[in-house]
Amino acid sequence: MPPTNGEGGSQQPQQQQQQQQQQQQQQQQQQQQQQGGSGSSDFVRKLYKMLEDPSYHSVVRWSDDGDSFVVLENEKFTKTILPKHFKHSNFASFVRQLNKYDFHKVRHNDENGESPYGRDAWEFKHPEFRADRKDNLDNIRRKAPAPRKQQQSEEAFNASQQQIAALSESLQATQQQLQALQQQCYELEKTNRLLVSEVMTLQKMVKAQNQASNEIINHLGSMEDRRRNNRGATQAAPNFHAGAMSFLTDGAEEPAPELRRARELLSVVGPDLQANRELERLYMTYNQNGAPAEPAATNSSAVMFTQAAAPGTQATAPGMPLVHNPLNDPQNMMYPVAQTPSIDPSFHTDQMHNMPYSRPLSNPAVVAETSSSQITPSQITPPPKDQMSSMWRDKKPRVLLVEDDKTCARIGAKFLSTLDCGVDTAGDGLEAVERINQDSTRFDLIFMDIIMPNMDGVSATAMIRMVSPHVPIIAMTSNIRGEDINTYFQYGMNDVLAKPFTRDNMSRLLRRHLAHLLKDPQSAASTGIVLTTDDLTLAGQTAGPATTGVGVGVAGAPSGGAHGPGPPAQHQQGYAMAPPTTMQPAPPQVKFEQSPTAAPAPGLDPSSAAAAPTWQSTNPAGVQLQPPPPPTPTQPSPTSAAPPAGLDPASAVAAAAAAAAAAAAAAASMTPGGYLAAAPPPPPPPGAMVLTPAGTPTGVGHPAPSGAGSAAGARGPPGPGPVGPGSVVDDSRPEKRQRLMQGGYASVSGHGHGHPGVGVAGFVQ
C-alpha cells in the first residue's frame, strides 16, 4: 500500500536531517584535511585527479614505474594546467607547496646527469603517492612545524630577558659610580676653593706682618741713630779725640747687628711671584665662575675646612655661596637613558657574569651638586717640575754613594735624587778610591758603606783622606755602638747614618754637612743629632786591657791617635819615630775582626794619651763618647826589647818585625771557630806597599810588643792593613767570619802575644 499523506509528511523531515548530517560530516572532513587531520588534503586529491586526466599526458603524467609524476613541459604546465586546478600563478610556488607536503624532486645520478624524460623535465616523488594506491592519499599530510623552532624562540626570549636585566643592572651601577665621582669632584672642588681662599688670606696676613716688621725695624733704627747722636753731642771737648775714637770703634757708622740681621731675614723670606700670580688667577677664576652648591652636611668632611678656619678670618671667598639648590641635584644631571635599551646582537649570556659591578652606595640620597660652569683641566694646570722649590742654591751637590748591596744602593740613590742631588754609585771601596783618584774635587759628600768586597769602607776612607782631607764622609752601617763609631771617626769619617735609613735622616745629614750650598743656611741649624747616647754603647765598656801591636794605617792613612787627625805626612813621621816597645792603650773591642789602631805621638805617656780628649772621643755630632780605659802593664817579651845602642830605628823595626813573624809562625794553631790559622809570610820592610788577596795596596805594620796575655787569652788587635798576625775572627759572628774567609782572608790567633800589625783590608761588621 502506498503511504498515506501523514506517513509521507513524517518521512520528509527525516531525509532532510540526514542530508544535513552528511553535509556537516563533509565540512568536518574538509576542515580536518585543511588542518592536517585524518582525511587527505584537497591539494593532494587535485594533484591525483589531474594526473588521471589523459588529456594532460603530454604535459604532466605518471612515471614509468608509477611511483612519481613528471612535469614534461614547464611552460605549458604553468600557463594552462595550474590556473585550472590550483591557485598558484607560477611554477615556483607550486614547487614550494609540494615541499610542504613532503614531495621531493628526483635527482638522477647518471653519467650525463639528465632525466630520461627530457632535459627540462621535473620529477617529484612521495613514498605514499603512487598511481595504483589511491587509498594512500589520506596518509599524505602537510608537514607540521618543528617544535625545536618554538623552543629556540623561547630560549632566545629568555636570553633577551636576561640581557635586558643585566644591562639594566649595569646601567644602574654605572649611574651610581657616576654619582660617586660627581660627589668626589664636588668635594675636591669645594676644598680647593677653600684652600685657595685661605692661602690668599694668609698671604695678606704675612704681607701685613712684613710691613709691620719693617716699620718696627725702621723705628728702632731711627731711635738708635738718635741715641748715638745724643751721646756724641754730650761728650766733653778735652776728651774729643778719645771720644771720637771710641765712637768710631763702637760702630756708630753701622746699625745695630740685630737690626741688620732682621732686615736680612725679611729680605730673604720673599714671596714667590709666580706662585702668587697662579693663586690670583685661580682666585679670580673661582669668583667669576661661581661656587657649587653645598649638599646637606651629613658627614664631617663637608665642614672640615670650615671648622679649621682661623677665628677672625673669612672662611670662604666672596661670591662663593654654600646654599643647597635642588635644581643642581646630580640625579637630575644624569645622562639620558632610553626607555627600551637596545641589545647588542653579539652579546651572549656567558658574558653577563664577567661584567664588573660596583657596590651600591650606602646612602645614595647624599649626592653632589656641580656648578653651572665647570672648570676645564686646561684652566687649572700644575706648575712645571723645574719650577719646584729646591733647598740648594745654584750648584747642586754631587754625592758619591759607595754600597755593594744593589737594593740599598737603589734606595739611597732614589732618596738623593728626590733631594735634588747628583748621584754617582760605587760597588766597593776600591772603586770609590779610583773615582777619587780620577777627580778629587768632583764630589761634595760621600756615603760610605763599611762591609764591602775588595776594600772595606774604613780602609777606603783612610786612602781617600790622603787625597781629599776635607770632603765629608758619612758611614752607612747598622753598628752604631760607641766603640764602632770611635773607629769610624778615627779613620777620617765625619758622621754616621744608621741603617735602615730614611729620606729624612739622609736629608738631615746633607743639610748639616753641606750647609754652604743651601739657599737658607739657617735651616741646617735645626737638624738634630742622628746618634743619641741611648743608641751608643760607650767606648771602653766591653774592651779589656791587652797589649797591642802598633800598625801603620792603610797606605799611610791618618789615624786618630793622641794628636787627632792631621796631614798624612805628620802621621807617617810619628809612626816612624815611635819606638817598637811603646805601650799603647787597647782600642775598643768593636765588631770588626781587626780593629785598626795607631801609635801615640812620641813623648806622650800612654795613660795621658788615653785620657786626653781627642777627636776620636767626640764625634762631629757632639755626642760625648767615653775614651777607652788605660791598659794593664805587662811584662815585655824578649822579642820586643829595646833596640841596642847604635842601631837606627828602621833597622830596629825590621828586626823586631822578623822576630815577631817567626814567633807567629811557630804559634799557628786552630782558631776558636775551628779554622786552621795559617802562618804569616815574612813581613816586608816598613813603609813598603803590599797587596791584599783582593788586590788592595796597604801599608806594612810596625812590629808590636808581645805580652803575656790574660787568662782568657787576650789578643792584641792588629794595625790597619790586610789580615795578618794578631787578628782573630770573632767566633760569635759566624756569618761575618764566613764572609771574611770567602773574600780570601786568613785568620791567625794571637794566643796572648802581640804580633806585627800587618793591618786589615776587609773589616767585618
Swiss-Prot record:
GO terms for biological process? phosphorelay signal transduction system
Q: Please give the Pfam families that the UniProt record associates with this protein.
A: HSF_DNA-bind (PF00447), Response_reg (PF00072)
Region Hydrophobic repeat HR-A/B: which residues?
Answer: 160-220
Looking up PROSITE patterns in the UniProt record yields: HSF_DOMAIN, RESPONSE_REGULATORY
4-aspartylphosphate occurs at 449
| Transactivation domain as annotated region, ranges | 542-765
Q: Locate the compositionally biased regions of type Low complexity.
A: 11-35, 569-584, 637-647, 699-715
DNA-binding domain as annotated region, ranges = 40-145
Domain named Response regulatory: residues = 398-514
This entry's Gene Ontology molecular function terms read: DNA-binding transcription factor activity; identical protein binding; sequence-specific DNA binding
Coarsely, its chief localization is: nucleus
Q: Which InterPro entries match?
A: CheY-like_superfamily, HSF_DNA-bd, Sig_transdc_resp-reg_receiver, WH-like_DNA-bd_sf, WH_DNA-bd_sf
Coiled-coil region: 157-198
Provide ranges: composition bias, Gly residues: 550-564, 755-765
Its GO CC terms are: nucleus
Q: Where is the composition biased (Pro residues)?
A: 626-636
Per UniProt, subcellular location reads as: Nucleus
Q: Which UniProt keywords apply?
A: Coiled coil, DNA-binding, Nucleus, Phosphoprotein, Transcription, Transcription regulation, Two-component regulatory system
According to the record, the residues making up region (Disordered) are: 1-42, 371-391, 550-647, 686-765
Give the quaternary structure.
Homotrimer.
How does the entry describe the domains?
Answer: Homotrimerization occurs through formation of a three-stranded coiled-coil structure generated by intermolecular interactions between HR-A/B regions allowing DNA-binding activity.
Q: What does this protein do?
A: Transcription factor that is part of a SLN1-YPD1-SKN7 two-component regulatory system, which controls gene expression in response to changes in the osmolarity of the extracellular environment. Under low osmotic conditions, phosphorylated and activated by the phosphorelay intermediate protein YPD1. Also activated in response to oxidative stress, independent on the two-component regulatory system. Regulates heat shock genes in response to oxidative stress and genes involved in cell wall integrity in response to osmotic changes.
The family this protein is said to belong to = Belongs to the SKN7 family.
PANTHER family, per database record: HYBRID SIGNAL TRANSDUCTION HISTIDINE KINASE J
What is this protein's record name? Answer: Transcription factor SKN7
- Source species: Chaetomium thermophilum (strain DSM 1495 / CBS 144.50 / IMI 039719) (Thermochaetoides thermophila)
Gene name tied to this protein: SKN7
